[in-house]
Curated annotation (Swiss-Prot):
Membrane topology, as annotated: Peripheral membrane protein
Family annotation (SUPFAM superfamilies): TPR-like (SSF48452)
Family classification: Belongs to the Ycf3 family.
Keyword entries, A-Z: Chloroplast, Membrane, Photosynthesis, Plastid, Repeat, Thylakoid, TPR repeat
UniProt source species: Acorus calamus var. americanus
Function: Essential for the assembly of the photosystem I (PSI) complex. May act as a chaperone-like factor to guide the assembly of the PSI subunits.
Protein name: Photosystem I assembly protein Ycf3
Gene3D superfamilies, per the entry: Tetratricopeptide repeat domain (1.25.40.10)
Amino acid sequence: MPRSRINANFIDKTSTIVANILLRIIPTTSGEKEAFTYYRDGMSAQSEGNYAEALQNYYEATRPEIDPYDRSYILYNIGLIHTSNGEHTKALEYYFRALERNPFLPQAFNNMAVICHYRGEQAIRQGDSEIAEAWSDQAAEYWKQAIALTPGNYIEAQNWLKITRRFE
C-alpha cells in the first residue's frame, strides 16, 4: 500500500486528498504523476524519520521526473537525508546536482556551507590549520551565494562572515 494511503495525521490526509485531486484535474503525464507520487511518499517517510524508505522513494521519483526544477527538489531532499546520515560527501554531490538544475536553491548553498564549516572545524581539532582554512573559505563562498539569493536570511552565517572577515 502506498505510504500516502496510510498517513494517520489529519493534515497529511488532507494534503494527500488535495494532491490527488490536483493530479486528476491538472493535465500531467503518467510519468509526472508517478514521480510526484514517489516524491510525496518520500517526503512523508522523511518527515517520520524513515530515511531508507524516503531515499528509495526519492530515487524512484528521479526515474520518471524530467522537469529540471522538480528534479532539483528531489535531489535536494536526497542530499538532506545523506547529511542527516553523516554522509557528507554524498550530500554535497546531491546538493551540487540540485543546483545544476536549479541555481536558485539558497538552502542547498547553506547546507553545503554548513558541511564545509563542519569539516573546517574537524580540521582545526586535528591540528591542520591549512585544511581548516580551505574548508572555511569554501563555506564562506557557499554562504555568500545563499545570502545573495535571500539577503534577509542566514543571519548567523552573515555574522560568522563578518567576524571572520570573509564578508565583502
